[in-house]
Each structure stands twice: as C-alpha cells, then as structure tokens.
Swiss-Prot record:
Main location (coarse class): membrane
Family: Belongs to the TMEM71 family.
Species name: Homo sapiens
Keywords of the record: Membrane, Transmembrane, Transmembrane helix
Protein name, entry field: Transmembrane protein 71
Compartment(s): Membrane
Superkingdom of source: Eukaryota
Gene: TMEM71
Short name of one Pfam family: TMEM71
Amino acid sequence: MYRISQLMSTPVASSSRLEREYAGELSPTCIFPSFTCDSLDGYHSFECGSIDPLTGSHYTCRRSPRLLTNGYYIWTEDSFLCDKDGNITLNPSQTSVMYKENLVRIFRKKKRICHSFSSLFNLSTSKSWLHGSIFGDINSSPSEDNWLKGTRRLDTDHCNGNADDLDCSSLTDDWESGKMNAESVITSSSSHIISQPPGGNSHSLSLQSQLTASERFQENSSDHSETRLLQEVFFQAILLAVCLIISACARWFMGEILASVFTCSLMITVAYVKSLFLSLASYFKTTACARFVKI
C-alpha cells in the first residue's frame, strides 16, 4: 500500500487559461471552484463527486491510479497548492484518503469426502482378496496402484487447500521414496532367491520329487478305485446270469419245489462267496499299495 507521502506531487499539463501570477513560489491556495487552475483536464476518468452529509457541501474527489482499486482521496480547497508550472502539491493535513473494504474470503473450506452407507457393502475394493491368493504375487496389483494414486490426489488437494501450512512437494517426495524403497527390497529378495547355493537346489529337487511321487500315488489310487468299481459291477452281473441259467435248468429237469429250494441255497452260497471274494481282493490291494509306497 502506498503512503500519502509518495503521492504528494502529480504533474499535469499546463492550461492556457492559467494565470501565471505566481513567480518562483507556491501559492498558498488555488481557487478550486473557479476554472483558473485547470488541473483535472487529463484525469476526467478518475473524477468523482461526494457530498458531506453534515453540511451538504460538495466535495470533489479524485480516484488515484496509484492507489489500490478500492481507494480514493478527497480534495478540498485547502488540500493542494499550485505553482507557476501547473504542478499540484497535495497538503497531507488537508487530504483524506478513503478506502472501501471488499469482503474477500481468506480461508477456504476443506473439502470433505462424504461416503454413503451403501459404499460400505461395495465389494469392488476387495476384488484382489476374493479373486487371488494373499501370498500369490509379491508385486503390487493395478487396484493397489489406483488406490495409491487416489490417496496422492487427496493429499495434493488437501495441500492446495492449505498451501500456507503444508509443503506438498515433501509429501510427494516421501511417496516416491517409499515406492522406490519397496521396489529395491523386492528386487534384492528376488536376486537372493536366484543366487542360492547348490545345496539349496538339491533340497528343492528332493522336495519336487516327493511332490511328484505323492501326485502319482493319488493318480494310482483313483485308478484303483475305478477298476475296483468296474470289477464289482462285472462280478455281480456274472453272478446274476449264472443264477438265472441254473434256475431255468433246474425247473426244466426237476419240479417246481426242488427248483425253488436249489435256487435259494445257491443264492445264499453265492452271497457268502461274494463277500469272501471281495474281502480277499481288498486285502491283496491294500498290501500291494503299501509295498508301492515303501518303494
């Protein structure tokens, strides 16, 4: 803001109607109501008028281009002095500077993010947990990168809202340094895993061989279960066919009573033999599997 002492002298063009009665000295007053001192000819765009509410007298005010846009100073007859060259010198004791205060918001409200109640049940943020394993991938997923970008955007907006209190560049530098440190740790861990001694490689090979053996055993057990089911079905079909053939032959050669008795006894013996045969088959299969596992 400029002080009044900086605005003491304002040169203007000399007027043809100005009577040069003063030689070498400043006149104590310049008759402002008369047009003998035509000092405001070049500044009509800055002229304004004001009326004293107490006395009702008319005051001439002039908006200064050197002041702020909301400031102006009021002239009276005793506010300035004129010399022979037409220069005007303001009298600070008789000049009042007025300002109109403009209401300007200095502090801005912080932007608050309002989350709705339905967003709490949104599963889009947990897709990486639902569709992937926790320890499956060491590197960050795209959803995690988007989340980091969103948090950085919120931090920058908060910094722009409070530019006088916070340093946004330091925050962004911290984010970048943290990300670079994480990437360096990941690369160092991967290089450590790659550069293992030969003993570690042999241990990993033994583990792989054990895993392949267990997988083969599971495949063989599934194959054995399928073959066992087929054998049981085939054996039952053969027994049924044999019983039907024997019953038909007995009825043809013998009477009805003898055929029924023979058929019942045959069914009992077949059921006993079937259970005995199945128990023996299961015993031999379990022993064979145990020997295969030991090998």
